[in-house]
Structures are given as C-alpha cells and as structure tokens.
Amino acid sequence: RFKKIRRLGALPGFTSKRPRSGSDLKNQLRSGKKSQYRIRLEEKQKLRFHYGLTERQLLKYVHIAGKAKGSTGQILLQLLEMRLDNILFRLGMASTIPGARQLVNHRHILVNDRIVDIPSYRCKPRDIITTKNKQRSKALIQNYIASSPHHEELPNHLTIDPFQYKGLVNQIIDNKWIGLKIN
C-alpha cells in the first residue's frame, strides 16, 4: 500500500495516508524523462487503486464510456464516481473506499429501502442511501461520520443527514467535484 502511494502520489480513496514531500523529489530525480507509455500506465494505475478496481472491471467501464456520447475520460470518471462504494466514501460514511466496500458487502447499506450488497452498484439521481436499522450498523456509520474530517466539503451532487444516517444522490456528479487528479 505504501509503495503504491509513494509511486503514484496521494490516493484519498485508497488510504488516508499521504506521501512525504521529500520522497516525491527523489522519485522525480531518479526517474528522468517519462515515456508516454509510462504516463498512461501510471494514470491507469491511479484509477485502479483509487477506486479499488480490477483490470477487467476498469476495461468494462472504459468500454461503456467509449460507447456513450461525450468525452470518454469524463464519462469514465462519472461512472466510477457514481458507484455505491465511492458515494459512501464521498458522504463520509466510510474513511476509505475499501472500507465502504466492506460496509456494502456486509449488508449494512440500503439503497431505496432495499439491501444492496454489491459495491459496484451504479447509483442514480434521487437514490436514497441509508443504513440498516440495526444498532451495529448505525454505530459503524456514526464512528465514520464523527471521525470524518472532510464533512464540510461534501460534493454538490450529494446531501447527507448525519442524524438519520441518510444520504441522497441529487444528480450525476459535476466534473469539478471529482477528487482524483488524472492527466
């Protein structure tokens, strides 16, 4: 995990740790001129590790984005940002995307009052994301929300009610709110 962060830079969804500033300078001095292949590979790896995708899943999303009208890169990022695990992370209900995946896999999350246990579930506008009415589920989410430092900077396509453990997807994400810097 730390090797990946040192190599690719800060990945907020992957872990809350940040690379030290001195290691960035060493990497740049050591690496020399980057080839086009290396730049594209690093950007692809950033996407994979940040969103927790396998190679096959990423290829599937690229294929869907290629068929849609508009910029393939922007549509790809919109598809990835509208995944359930990522929306839980953005709402502050989980500290990292892998943590959000675990919440979904362990059936703590309801979408429109139905249990969803698939982290890659594609959320749509007007979806209501809540926790189960069990005490354990509410305690887990409450701990994450209380310890969440980025609660103020909630993207404008999401709203959260921390007292009812409820989040709402208002619209498809706007490009300026995508948290990952991709070249």
Swiss-Prot record:
SMART domains: Ribosomal_S4, S4. Keywords: Chloroplast, Plastid, Ribonucleoprotein, Ribosomal protein, RNA-binding, rRNA-binding. One of its GO terms (cellular component) is chloroplast. Pfam families: Ribosomal_S4 (PF00163), S4 (PF01479). GO terms for molecular function: rRNA binding; structural constituent of ribosome. Its main location: plastid. One of its GO terms (biological process) is translation. Disulfide bonds: none annotated. It comes from the Eukaryota. It is found in: Plastid, Chloroplast. Gene3D superfamilies: Ribosomal Protein S4 Delta 41, Chain A, domain 1, RNA-binding S4 domain. Residues 82-143 form the S4 RNA-binding domain. The keyword Cell cycle does not apply. One of the primary rRNA binding proteins, it binds directly to 16S rRNA where it nucleates assembly of the body of the 30S subunit. With S5 and S12 plays an important role in translational accuracy. Belongs to the universal ribosomal protein uS4 family. Part of the 30S ribosomal subunit. Contacts protein S5. The interaction surface between S4 and S5 is involved in control of translational fidelity. This is Small ribosomal subunit protein uS4c. It comes from Aristea capitata. The gene is rps4.
